[in-house]
């Protein structure tokens, strides 16, 4: 994608959310160079930004979008952040990360940082936050109710729109799924 975007001077903004982990290995094991530096090898301007700072992200992305939209070509933005949870449901990050590391990064939670920023400037207050929590709860209840109202989809139907014309493999898979559903 880099080569194509650079060659075509495409108005693309690549955003890489670097959570510093490649499953259970730090990304520094895979590459000693920061990811954003790779883009410059393709002639693409690149920047690394604190991905946990909403204001910084907004400023960098606005600038990157303006650059790309003005016809100057692609831009690469690396949002430097941290994966707080496990990689998968079978992953145990305590095998390769310390509680101290997680605690340190937990203090940079972007939601908490933005809330603090807005409160310190008098833009929002606790009354506003309480109202937001009520709206969130109501929205969540609405979404859960809508999900429960929908019928369970027929699994074989999920393959109907994979291709304009189903391939023999897709048809065979759909038949197998339909047979499996009948046997349940």
Residue ranges with predicted function:
Residues 142, 148-184:
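C-terminal intrinsically disordered, low-complexity extensions immediately downstream
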Residues 1-149:
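Glycine-rich ThDP/TPP pyrophosphate-binding loop and its adjacent helix/strand module
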């Amino acid at each position: 994608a880099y080569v194509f975007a650079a060659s075509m001077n495409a108005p693309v903004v690549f955003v890489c959310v670097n959570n510093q982990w490649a499953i259970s290995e730090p990304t520094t094991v895979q590459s000693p160079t920061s990811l954003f530096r790779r883009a410059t090898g393709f002639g693409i301007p690149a920047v690394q930004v604190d991905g946990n700072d909403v204001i910084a992200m907004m400023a960098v992305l606005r600038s990157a979008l303006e650059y790309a939209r003005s016809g100057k070509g692609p831009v690469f933005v690396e949002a430097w952040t941290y994966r707080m949870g496990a990689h998968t449901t079978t992953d145990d990050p305590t095998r390769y990360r310390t509680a101290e590391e997680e605690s340190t990064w937990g203090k940079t939670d972007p939601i908490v940082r933005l809330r603090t920023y807005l409160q310190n400037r008098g833009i929002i207050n606790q009354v506003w936050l309480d109202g937001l929590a009520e709206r969130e709860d109501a929205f969540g209840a609405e979404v859960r109710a809508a999900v429960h109202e929908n019928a369970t989809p027929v699994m074989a139907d999920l393959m109907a729109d994979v291709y304009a014309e189903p391939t023999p493999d897709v048809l065979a898979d759909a038949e197998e799924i339909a047979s499996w559903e009948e046997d349940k």
